[in-house]
Amino acid sequence: MTQTLSQLENSGAFIERHIGPDAAQQQEMLNAVGAQSLNALTGQIVPKDIQLATPPQVGAPATEYAALAELKAIASRNKRFTSYIGIGYTAVQLPPVILRNMLENPGWYTAYTPYQPEVSQGRLEALLNFQQVTLDLTGLDMASASLLDEATAAAEAMAMAKRVSKLKNANRFFVASDVHPQTLDVVRTRAETFGFEVIVDDAQKVLDHQDVFGVLLQQVGTTGEIHDYTALISELKSRKIVVSVAADIMALVLLTAPGKQGADIVFGSAQRFGVPMGYGGPHAAFFAAKDEYKRSMPGRIIGVSKDAAGNTALRMAMQTREQHIRREKANSNICTSQVLLANIASLYAVYHGPVGLKRIANRIHRLTDILAAGLQQKGQKLRHAHYFDTLCVEVADKAGVLARAEAAEINLRSDILNAVGITLDETTTRENVMQLFSVLLGDNHGLDIDTLDKDVAHDSRSIQPAMLRDDEILTHPVFNRYHSETEMMRYMHSLERKDLALNQAMIPLGSCTMKLNAAAEMIPITWPEFAELHPFCPPEQAEGYQQMIAQLADWLVKLTGYDAVCMQPNSGAQGEYAGLLAIRHYHESRNEGHRDICLIPASAHGTNPASAHMAGMQVVVVACDKNGNIDLTDLRAKAEQAGDNLSCIMVTYPSTHGVYEETIREVCEIVHQFGGQVYLDGANMNAQVGITSPGFIGADVSHLNLHKTFCIPHGGGGPGMGPIGVKAHLAPFVPGHSVVQIEGMLTRQGAVSAAPFGSASILPISWMYIRMMGAEGLKKASQVAILNANYIASRLQDAFPVLYTGRDGRVAHECILDIRPLKEETGISELDIAKRLIDYGFHAPTMSFPVAGTLMVEPTESESKVELDRFIDAMLAIRAEIDQVKAGVWPLEDNPLVNAPHIQNELVAEWAHPYSREVAVFPAGVADKYWPTVKRLDDVYGDRNLFCSCVPISEYQ
C-alpha cells in the first residue's frame, strides 16, 4: 500500500460528502461546457482584477467526527446554570416527538418559503395552526405567520401604528416603562430612522403627553406585574391612539385576551411553546391585529383559498403588502420569518391541546404562588401583588443572595434596584422551589411545599378576577385530537408528506442557494450546552458560546475581506437594515447626516429598497444596460446628481442577473468618489467564497445569508441569520445591546434584534460547515456551484435561452431562462412550466425575478450530475410538451402544462383531457413520484375571500 497515514485519515472527506458531483462527474460537465478544469472555468468567468491571489486562511478541513469533538469541547465551556432571569426567555420542555419528527427532520427543516403552495400544504397547515393559536390567545381577528422576535415585532407594531393612525400630525410613540429593556432598545433604533420621538413613562401617565399616535403596553410587566389596562385602553381609543400590547404566550392561556380589552395590536414571543432559549434564538414572534388593519400588517399571512378543482387549499395571502412586490413601499422589509420555530410552537399547542396548556400554565402559576407565599411568610416583601410567573423580591442583602444563588448554580435577575427577579417556567420542580427558598432565606427556612400548596390553592389572589380568561381557547379539532404520541407522530408525518423538501429533490430556486444542510452540522444545535443558555446569563457562563462566535466571526472576516463582523441580525433583511444604519451613523459622525440617497440597481431584490426606506433613506434607481449590468453612465449621472446627499449604493455580486459584472470595482470607485459607501448584498456570496471577497472588491459593508452560503437550513421560511461584515471605519456603528455588552464591539448604537447575538444557537451550523470544509473545500464549493449552473445553462440554452451571460457566454452560479419568446409564440407561461415541474418531481425555479416572464435557476454545489441531468431532462421534456401545444396536438386551454400540477385523485376520476393519465402524472418516465395534494391555487379567490384561521377538519381529509 502506497498511501500515507495522512491520506488514509482523509481529513477532507466531508468535502466529497458536501459537493454533489464526484471528480468524474465534474470532468464530464467541464467537458460539456468547454473548460479544462475548475480553476480554468472560474478563471474565465470571474474578472481578473478581483480574483484572490491566495486563499483565505481559515484552516485545513476536518472530518465530521473531529469537528464534532472539537465543537463539543468548546460547548462544554458553557455552564448550565438554572436560569430564573426571565425578561422574555424561559426554559422549556420540547416534546421529544416534536424534537425527533420536526426539528431533527430534513423533511421539515430543508424546505423553502412556501411561495409555491402546491408543494407546501403541510407547513402551510402548521402555520395556519400557529395563526389560530395567536387569534385564540390574543382575541384579535387577523394574525401573521411569525416575525423574527418579540422586540422586532414591537418595532413593527410601532411602524404599523403610524401607518393606520388617523392622527397624521402626531409623531410621538409612548412606551410603558415596564416593557422589556431589549424591546425598548429595538423600538428606539427603529424610531430614530422614522423620525419618531419615543416617550418612556409609567403607563398611567400616557394621557399627560400630547401628539401621541401610538402606545406600547406590556400586559405582564418586565418585573412581573399583571396590568389590567381595560380602562386605559378605552380612554386611549377614544382619543384615536393606536394601542399595542406585548403579551406572554403562556400567561395568555390564563389571562384575559388583550384584544377583548380593546387592543389594536398584540404581539409577543412564542418561545415558551417548546423552543429552547438557545442563548437568544431563533424564536418566532406572534403578531395579531384587528381585521380593519390587515392590509397594513407586516410579515407573512397564511390564507385559506381554493385550488383549480374547488378544493380547500392554503397559500400565502396578500403578498402585495410585501417587499418582493412593493419594494420601498412595502409594510416591512421582512423576507425570512421564523417558520420552523413557529411550527414547533404550533405543534406544541396541538400536542398539549387546551387542557394540557392550561395544566402547564396553572402549574407554573401554582409554583409561583407557593414561592411567593413562603417568602411572605418569612417576612420578604414582594413588589407586586398581581403576577403570573415572575416575582420581584425586595432583599436587604442582595449581594449575599446573589452569592448564594451563584454557589447553587442559579441565575436570578439582578438588574432591579434593591430587588431580585425570579421567573419560573414549565421545567421548574418542587425541588427547585425549595432551593430558591434556601437561596433567599437560608437553609433553615423550615418551609414545606405541600403545606404552602394547600394554603394558596384555597386563597390565591395573585391574578385579578377581571384578568382571568373567561372564554374557551383552541376549540378547533386540530388542538383536541393528537395527544397520544402515535397520533401526533402520524399527524406530523401527514403534513411532511404534503411538502417537497431537499430530502426528496433538488430545489433549483435562483437567489436562494438551497444547498445541503448536513446532519453533522445540525447535531450541535440540540446539545443542551448550546440550547439551554439564557441570553442574559453572566458572560463567564457562556465562554463556549463566546469562543465559538469569535472563531466564526474570525473566519467570516477572512472570507469576506472585512475587518469586523456583527452577529446580531436575525435575517438577511435585518442585516441589510443593520448595515445601512451603520452607514447612516457613520455619515452622521462626520456631520454629514444629510446624506440620505441610496442608489439601487433596477435588478435588485425587493428587500434592498424596503431596507433603505426603513433606514430613513431615499431610493434612487440606477438603470441596467441591455446585458443586465449596471449602466455606468446612469450610475455616474445619478451619483453626481445626488452629490453631497449620496449615502450609498446597494449592489449584489455576482449580479441578481447571474453574471460577474466586469465593472464592479469601477462601480465602487464612482460611489466612493462622491462620498458614498458601498453596500454589497451578500445574497450571492456562494459564488464568491474563496474566489474573491466583498472587501477585496471594494465594498464597505455586506450582510451574509448564513442560511444560504453557510448552510443554515431555510426551515420552510426561517430561521435565517444575516450577520454583517464591515470595514474598520464602520465597525463603531454596528448594532449594540442595552442589556449585554458585546465583547470586542466598541459600539454605542441601538439593537436591531432582541438578543445580542441574534439567533445564536444556529451559529454552530455555520461553524461546523467552515470547519469541515476548510479553505480548499470552501473554494471548491464555489467553483462547483459555478460549474453546475453553467452545465445547466449550456444544456438548456437551445430550448430555453439564457437571458444574461458574461464573458464567453458564461454565467455565475445561477442563470435566468427567458420564457417570454415561448409565451408570446405558444401562450404557455413561466407559471405553467413551474407548475408542470411539480409533476416531474421538482420544486420550481424562481419565477419572474428579477425579470418578469423568466425562470431563475440556481443548482448549488450540492447537487450531483445525476440530479442535474434529471432536472435538465424534465425541462427538455416540458419544452417538447410546449411544442405539442404549438403544433396544435393539444389545445392551449387543455394540456398538461396549463392543468398542472396533477394530483392522485385525478387518476380515478373521469378523464376528459386530450392527453393520457400517464402523461399527466408519470411524464417522461418519472418513477420516483412526488404527489402534490392540491391542484393549482386560485390566488385571486384567496385574496378576495381572505380567511386566515383554521377551517373545519373535514377540509383536510
Curated annotation (Swiss-Prot):
E.C. designation(s): 1.4.4.2
Chain positions found as N6-(pyridoxal phosphate)lysine: 708
One Pfam family matching this protein: GDC-P
Enzyme class: oxidoreductase
UniProt entry keywords in alphabetical sequence: Oxidoreductase, Pyridoxal phosphate
Entry's Gene Ontology cellular component terms: cytosol; glycine cleavage complex
Keyword field contains tRNA processing: no
GO-annotated molecular function: glycine binding; glycine dehydrogenase (decarboxylating) activity; pyridoxal phosphate binding
Cofactor: pyridoxal 5'-phosphate
Lineage: superkingdom: Bacteria
Catalytic reaction equation(s): N(6)-[(R)-lipoyl]-L-lysyl-[glycine-cleavage complex H protein] + glycine + H(+) = N(6)-[(R)-S(8)-aminomethyldihydrolipoyl]-L-lysyl-[glycine-cleavage complex H protein] + CO2
GO biological process, one term: glycine decarboxylation via glycine cleavage system
Task performed by this protein: The glycine cleavage system catalyzes the degradation of glycine. The P protein binds the alpha-amino group of glycine through its pyridoxal phosphate cofactor; CO(2) is released and the remaining methylamine moiety is then transferred to the lipoamide cofactor of the H protein.
Family per record: Belongs to the GcvP family.
NCBIfam families with a match to the protein in the record: gcvP, PRK04366.1
Known partners and oligomeric status: The glycine cleavage system is composed of four proteins: P, T, L and H.
Name of protein: Glycine dehydrogenase (decarboxylating)
